């Protein structure tokens, strides 16, 4: 089985005095799939009245502890959290929201799944699967000849496919081991393998494997396998929080994920779901009243879904690369890791909005070179080296060439502060030292002359280092660098985080160095941290 790693963003810490408003907090809750409700007796629900929010947090296993489900009351005033109490009214020092699931790492064969344990499965789900798909699941040995005949007659009588003849075990074998060809040979292989599977595993293991394996839809290029991921894909919340009408819809989709796709074919989906509810009532899995109430509910699927298998593809690309650097490939593809990342979802969304606005402004300008402009964003925390947001191109949610990591361009005047840092570190210069902003010439090994110029084509004579840097004077920078030495400037690039020092060409001094945005971010993160280098990390 392809075990899907779960990749999470940063969790939101909750504590008194935190800079957090009720609006932003409820925004975070909605992002995580929490439902607004008059009562908060179930995990995953909240209620807001003015500056007070009652929330029932979900159970979640963090890297350092298992946080149980708990009810909290939060009060907000003036943009800060003023109180944090539990259901008994006692003060709570700190709590954490369950983090946002942002994607998967290393799913093979284009398949995604969230593996769920039996404890994470609502008891209704296996009972519903047995009632609709395999009524004799607890008795048969892998195949059920009578079920095949019964399904045939039932479907003929109804004029539509209402029942299937394959057992759940056969469906599991078909999904995991075999292809979708409809031949007698394949059906025979399916039956034999189902019998073998039943002989080697107990019913609970087979049911749990089925719940984690069965195909339930398509998310762009990724196949959605298992009820755990399907719950997030269709409803935006964990499987354990689904209600009767939602469980029934997922069971309905089993028969034909494309045909009963609730986003593309809502009428078909609701008809099939209501059929499932009638079957559950007939089998006394639920009462008639419960089935009728559930049948009156809307489908409840989320309005849209991010395509491509992830929420933040550029950031996840960085996560993948760092994991490949630090772990063995077989551990990443087989272990089913839980990966906690440094991504701040709110900051990421603000970065996306800012980039979109700036590109739109540039597109609206009359400058020809602005048309079709691309852009990237890399946001870091200087003290920790954490990458908190990343956008790899104009279309932030699309997979493809990650310009934040792979687009190498001349960095221009971004190189100049490194020249001045190299000079100051010699001890021979201070910010008030005088440097000449005068024409400079240097003969290159090929016989050509290197003759830089200022942007305005003018020279300014003697200026202080502070003035030369703030005005970004090319001539002053070149003269200073030649006095300090190209080798010292190149070494400063490496000291600040570049893996290799750039070639010692004079043009390097004014930015003729091709670097990626993530490399520039590493250099300037070190500068912002007072010269202490914290390698950029996403995990």
Task: Locate the predicted segments by residue.
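Short small-residue beta-strand/loop micro-motif enriched in glycine and branched aliphatics
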Residues: 138, 259-261, 398-401, 503
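Alpha-helix N-cap/helix-initiation motif
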Residues: 118, 161, 220, 262-266, ...
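Beta-lactam-recognizing serine transpeptidase/beta-lactamase-like catalytic domain environment
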Residues: 170-171, 224, 240, 281-400, ...
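Charged, low-complexity surface patches
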Residues: 18, 269, 374, 412, ...
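Extracellular glycan-interaction surfaces
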Residues: 421
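Juxtamembrane regions of bacterial inner-membrane/periplasmic proteins
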Residues: 1-364, 386-387, 438, 443, ...
């Amino acid at each position: 089985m392809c075990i899907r790693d779960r990749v999470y963003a940063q969790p939101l810490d909750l504590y008194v005095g935190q800079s957090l408003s009720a609006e932003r907090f409820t925004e975070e809750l909605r992002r995580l799939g929490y439902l607004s409700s008059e009562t908060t007796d179930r995990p995953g629900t909240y209620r807001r009245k003015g500056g007070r929010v009652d929330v029932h947090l979900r159970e979640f296993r963090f890297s350092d502890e298992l946080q149980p489900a708990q009810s909290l009351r939060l009060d907000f005033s003036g943009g800060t959290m003023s109180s944090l109490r539990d259901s008994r009214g006692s003060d709570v020092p700190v709590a954490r929201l369950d983090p946002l699931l942002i994607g998967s790492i290393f799913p093979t064969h284009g398949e995604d799944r969230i593996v769920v344990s039996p404890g994470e499965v609502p008891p209704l789900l296996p009972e519903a699967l047995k009632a609709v798909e395999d009524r004799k699941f607890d008795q048969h040995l892998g195949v059920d000849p009578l079920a095949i005949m019964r399904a045939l007659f039932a479907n003929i009588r109804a004029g539509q496919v209402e029942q299937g003849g394959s057992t759940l075990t056969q469906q599991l074998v078909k999904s995991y081991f075999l292809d979708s060809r409809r031949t007698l040979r394949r059906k025979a292989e399916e039956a034999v393998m189902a019998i073998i599977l039943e002989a080697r595993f107990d019913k609970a293991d087979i049911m749990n494997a089925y719940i984690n394996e069965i195909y339930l839809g398509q998310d762009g290029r990724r196949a959605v396998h298992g009820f755990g991921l399907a719950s997030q894909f269709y409803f935006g919340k964990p499987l354990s929080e689904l209600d009767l009408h939602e469980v029934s819809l997922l069971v309905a989709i089993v028969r034909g994920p494309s045909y009963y796709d609730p986003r593309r074919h809502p009428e078909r989906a609701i008809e099939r779901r209501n059929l499932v509810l009638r079957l559950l009532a007939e089998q006394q899995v639920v009462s008639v009243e419960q089935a009728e109430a559930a049948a009156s509910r809307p489908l409840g699927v989320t309005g849209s879904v991010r395509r491509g298998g992830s929420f933040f593809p550029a950031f996840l690309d960085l996560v993948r690369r760092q994991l490949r650097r630090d772990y063995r490939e077989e551990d990443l593809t087989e272990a089913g890791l839980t990966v906690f990342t440094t991504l701040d979802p709110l900051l990421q969304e603000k970065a996306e909005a800012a980039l979109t606005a700036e590109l739109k402004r540039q597109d609206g300008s009359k400058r020809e070179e602005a048309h079709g402009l691309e852009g990237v964003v890399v946001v870091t925390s200087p003290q920790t080296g954490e990458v908190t947001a990343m956008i790899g191109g104009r279309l932030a949610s699309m997979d493809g060439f990650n310009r934040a990591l792979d687009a190498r361009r001349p960095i221009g005047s971004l190189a100049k502060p490194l020249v001045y840092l190299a000079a100051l570190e010699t001890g021979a210069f201070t910010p008030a030292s005088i440097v000449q902003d005068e024409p400079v010439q240097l003969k290159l090994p090929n016989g050509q002359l290197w003759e830089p110029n200022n942007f305005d084509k003018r020279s300014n004579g003697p200026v202080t280092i502070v003035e030369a840097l703030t005005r970004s004077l090319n001539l002053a920078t070149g003269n200073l660098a030649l006095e300090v030495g190209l080798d010292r400037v190149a070494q400063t690039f490496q000291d600040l985080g570049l893996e290799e020092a750039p070639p010692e060409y004079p043009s390097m001094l004014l930015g003729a160095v091709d670097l990626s945005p993530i490399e520039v971010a590493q250099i300037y993160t070190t500068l912002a941290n007072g010269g202490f280098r914290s390698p950029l990390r996403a995990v």
